[in-house]
Amino acid sequence: MSREEYFLDKFDEGLIEPSMLVRMTQLWQETHGLEADGYFGPMTAASFNPPSSTVMHPFGLSVLMAAISDLGKGEEGGNNSGEYVESILGKEFDGDNDNDGSWCAAAVSHWILEASKSNNVTIEFSTSFGAKALYRNILAVGTEVSEPAAGDIVCWDRGAVGSWQGHIGVVERYESGFLHTIEGNKGSYPSKVRRFRYDLSRESRLEGFARFTDSSVSGSNA
């Protein structure tokens, strides 16, 4: 008996109830950046069969894992403030609720540094607390891609068109025209590291996507 036939039998026997399927669907959705409504729609179905043709770089996946481990961390006490924010900005936590500065790029830089430590490799580019600067640095030793994949870096333009201002995050996955990311410092206080979803057809201010390559890192595990 196949596993599919086994579960169909259990459903017919009443051992598996519809409410259980709803809850299992919600649990899957919660861990895959989907709205946890319990309905098995097209996006949920697509998440079971993600595209496999794109080659993802292992260092990028390590950066993504570092980002996932920071989910829920962020501002405390005041805007752009708190122990986590100050630590990734390279400041000693002083307990004040003062504004310590934007931290989206600091978060991505932190995840990159954590990935380099866990893989015992050296990054061949400079991190930065500026979103566009960090994106350019990664791109200088990486490659720009039109179709993002897990572990890629995504950057947006902010402020006046062409200004230095930007926003940056890590791609968790891309499927069916929707981009799923992990970002910090987006939204009003208290902003946290969290998952976001975008319809790329509506994103008019994307700077682009950068993918790590073998030239991005060096070392024993590179």
Predicted ranges, named:
Residues 13-21, 40, 55-59, 96-104, ...:
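Extracytoplasmic/periplasmic, Sec-exported soluble proteins
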Residues 25, 108, 151:
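Terminal peptide-recognition signature
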Residues 58-61, 118-189:
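...with weaker cross-activation on analogous glycine-rich loops/strands in unrelated enzymes
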Residues 200-222:
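Low-complexity, Gly/Ser/Thr/Pro-rich intrinsically disordered linker/tail segments
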